Amino acid sequence: MKKFDLIPYYDPYDLWATSFGQNVRKGFYKGHLKSKIMAVGIASCELFIPNLIRKFARTKKSLHPISVAQYILMACENSWISIGESLDYLALLREQAAIDDGESFSFGLGFTWVSKNGIYTSQEPFITHTPYAMEALLKLNSIDPSNLDSIKLFNKTWGFLESLIVMFNGNDKLALSYAPADEPRIVINANSYAALSYALHFINNHDCDKEVAYLKALNIVNWIIYNQRLDGGWMYYADNLPGNFIDCFHSCFVVKNLIKIRALLSLESSELNEAIDNGIDYIINNFYQKDVGLVKRFSVRDIKDP
């Protein structure tokens, strides 16, 4: 792959991250007609006049935690980063952290986000984002093992994992929150990231409680398998309440993370193998459009997300 530089950019969520966009989403989820109309307007501007609307809104190009982490992963995979440059990328990644203190190291969106599950501030760390930074830290450490800063920061993500709220615990099953905050609903794909994170610590963190890391990863996997539908799909939320859905985006995350966990922990489980196979079949049969070589976004939906 041809090398390219990581530079500030416009993001698809720029407009929704503004105070106006946040208020529209709040009203949308409350069912306000005015907010629904405004949401259509924002989406239309994003589709037809993306650059013009950003100039009008005075949106600045920026970097986000997930893009920096993903770039590092790709750059390491393609040998774009030298030993000397690894320190610079480590510093850049650290600048994106939501929490960086003596007890925890974690990452979020980098901007305020309004969802059905609550309002998350720009400094709220997410379990769906932090694992990418964890993997990036491990990659940077592999480039320069003598630099212990990256592995020390990786080890500190344990504090973030342990700060997540237990949403379900019983019968060898465990489910955690999306962020270290009170949330009304359990997000299934988020728990696949939590299980992956504990698996990464089990393999790479020599200071953590290995038994805790292994058991939590395994119990979360058990919970994910338990919540898989008979047709192989996973709902976004682990409930039957309004606003739930199945989309290709998050379905792929669940399957991808389960495959990684199976490899990391060398799990020989017929139930896990079956869950992965059924999940892949669901994605192919319900999302993939063979005639155009693309996938559709939803297979099950309640309301359209703004």
Report each predicted region and the residues it spans:
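Glycan-recognition and catalytic cores of secretory/periplasmic carbohydrate-active enzymes
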Residues: 1-306
